[in-house]
Amino acid sequence: MLKSGFYLLGGVVGAASSLPAFLAATTRSIWDPVNAGDVAAVGEITALTALEHMKQSMMSDRTGRMILRTQPRVTDETLEFASRQPPGTFGHRYAQFMKFNRFTPNGRTPVAHVADPTLAYVMQRQRETHDFLHTCIGCGRTVEEEIIVKLLEWRHTGLPIGLLAVIGSLPWLSRQQLRNMELYFEWAEVNAPNQRHGEVYIPYITNVWWESYLDKPYEQLLADTGITPIDVFLQQKKGKAALANGEAIDGK
């Protein structure tokens, strides 16, 4: 969490160095939060410190290094391949998600405010794999579900736009949804990168070659990444609460 705070501070410094563009994009984003171009611009202007960290984490991982070297892109052809995969595969779930929301990979906004080519690719990669993450954790495209995805992205990347998007979305939430935020932060922490010996291994999402799982069972992706889908986590929490309540009643 301290690292994420450091990256947020770095984002503030980056925004200050590009203040006119940042203020213009931020203002337009507030008035029109579905304006992908301005939201993307804010994300890029505040990203430099986090992007450096993301690149280093990729360089220290075998899969991450391969991704940086080959620089795969998520395109409409990727979606076409996924749509041909049978039910039960990650690709089938991804294709269904994209079809339901009428999304196409080629519709992603290209990176325009990151000068370094490698860092620009890291940012583009994060942007293009966003819908893979939606599919992996089982979230749709409501404001509340988008917040859940952004929280996980923030814990894995430190990109300030993740936390800024969460803060900016709070006024649109109901009281119950606001109360749920504590659970969502807990879930994101449970699914944060983890390489501690004897615990569930969770790689940085930047080091996951999502495309390689399109023709594989969805459960294999979950097993290899160690990520717990949000609905599974909430069911587990509900079960533990019910068990604790039952034990309390029995103890009376």
Swiss-Prot record:
Q: Which UniProt keywords apply?
A: Lyase, Membrane, Metal-binding, Mitochondrion, Mitochondrion inner membrane, Ubiquinone biosynthesis, Zinc
Mark the transmembrane ranges: none
Q: Mainly localized where?
A: mitochondrion
Q: Which reaction does it catalyse?
A: a 4-hydroxy-3-methoxy-5-(all-trans-polyprenyl)benzoate + H(+) = a 2-methoxy-6-(all-trans-polyprenyl)phenol + CO2
The family database entries (InterPro entries) matched by this protein are listed as:
Coq4, Coq4_euk
Q: Name one GO biological process term.
A: ubiquinone biosynthetic process
Annotated Gene Ontology cellular components are: extrinsic component of mitochondrial inner membrane
EC number from the UniProt entry: 4.1.1.130
Membrane association type: Peripheral membrane protein
Q: Where does this one sit in the cell?
A: Mitochondrion inner membrane
Recorded metabolic or biological pathway in which this protein acts: Cofactor biosynthesis; ubiquinone biosynthesis
Question: Taxonomically, which superkingdom?
Answer: Eukaryota
Which coenzymes or cofactors are required? Zn(2+)
What is the protein's known function?
Lyase that catalyzes the C1-decarboxylation of 4-hydroxy-3-methoxy-5-(all-trans-polyprenyl)benzoic acid into 2-methoxy-6-(all-trans-polyprenyl)phenol during ubiquinone biosynthesis.
- Spell out the note in the miscellaneous section: This protein may be expected to contain an N-terminal transit peptide but none has been predicted.
Which PANTHER family does the UniProt entry name for this protein? UBIQUINONE BIOSYNTHESIS PROTEIN, UBIQUINONE BIOSYNTHESIS PROTEIN COQ4 HOMOLOG, MITOCHONDRIAL
Q: Provide the family line.
A: Belongs to the COQ4 family.
Subunit composition and interactions: Component of a multi-subunit COQ enzyme complex.
Q: What is this protein called?
A: Ubiquinone biosynthesis protein COQ4 homolog 2, mitochondrial
The record lists the lineage as: Eukaryota, Discoba, Euglenozoa, Kinetoplastea, Metakinetoplastina
